[in-house]
């Protein structure tokens, strides 16, 4: 799926509202995913996945930081996420089915906190962007 010029604009503009809040929004999205979809917890058996935990904040910051990097390199997301794609496929072996689940929860959190900015066209653009990111992250799976 290709992002149109309008999609790229919508994503960049929306991401400006996320800057400075990556850690909190990422932690909330992860908490929602782990709570509503317990099977996604399997990759973190010894971690504290409770709401507000330092692990959720740390990992949420990493997740949203990677997405911020993808936004900053929106014209070449493949290159921007190449190393992360390798890591998820070869080292972590994360089930590719989990990426859309996390994307959904990121959109939910964005809808809660950015409702004035997440209009229907923007929502569609961000959804497409997260789908592209998920595709890139699973492109190295065999």
Curated annotation (Swiss-Prot):
Sites where the protein binds O2: 59
Domain of life of the source: Eukaryota
GO cellular component, one term: hemoglobin complex
UniProt KW Protein biosynthesis keyword: no
Signal peptide range: none
Keywords: Heme, Iron, Metal-binding, Oxygen transport, Transport
Any one of the GO BP annotations: hydrogen peroxide catabolic process
Binding site for heme b: 88
Claim: Ribosomal protein is one of the keywords in the record: no
Entry-linked InterPro entries: Globin, Globin-like_sf, Globin/Proto, Hemoglobin_a-typ, Hemoglobin_oxygen_transport
Domain Globin: 2-142
GO molecular function: haptoglobin binding; heme binding; metal ion binding; organic acid binding; oxygen binding; oxygen carrier activity; peroxidase activity
Tissue: Red blood cells.
CDD domains: Hb-alpha-like
Protein role: Involved in oxygen transport from the lung to the various peripheral tissues.
Subunit structure and binding partners: Heterotetramer of two alpha chains and two beta chains.
UniProt family annotation: Belongs to the globin family.
Entry protein name: Hemoglobin subunit alpha
Source organism per UniProt: Taricha granulosa
């Amino acid at each position: 799926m290709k992002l149109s010029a309008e999609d790229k604009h919508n994503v960049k503009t929306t991401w400006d509202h996320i800057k400075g809040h990556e850690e909190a929004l990422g932690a909330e999205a992860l908490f929602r995913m782990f709570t509503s979809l317990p099977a996604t917890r399997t990759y973190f058996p010894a971690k504290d996945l409770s709401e507000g935990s330092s692990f959720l904040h740390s990992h949420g910051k990493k997740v949203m930081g990677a997405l911020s990097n993808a936004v900053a390199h929106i014209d070449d997301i493949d290159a921007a996420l190449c190393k992360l794609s390798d890591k998820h496929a070869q080292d972590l072996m994360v089930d590719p089915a989990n990426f859309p689940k996390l994307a959904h929860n990121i959109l939910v959190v964005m809808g809660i906190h950015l409702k004035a900015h997440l209009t229907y066209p923007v929502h569609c653009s961000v959804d497409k962007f997260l789908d592209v990111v998920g595709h890139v992250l699973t492109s190295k799976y065999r």
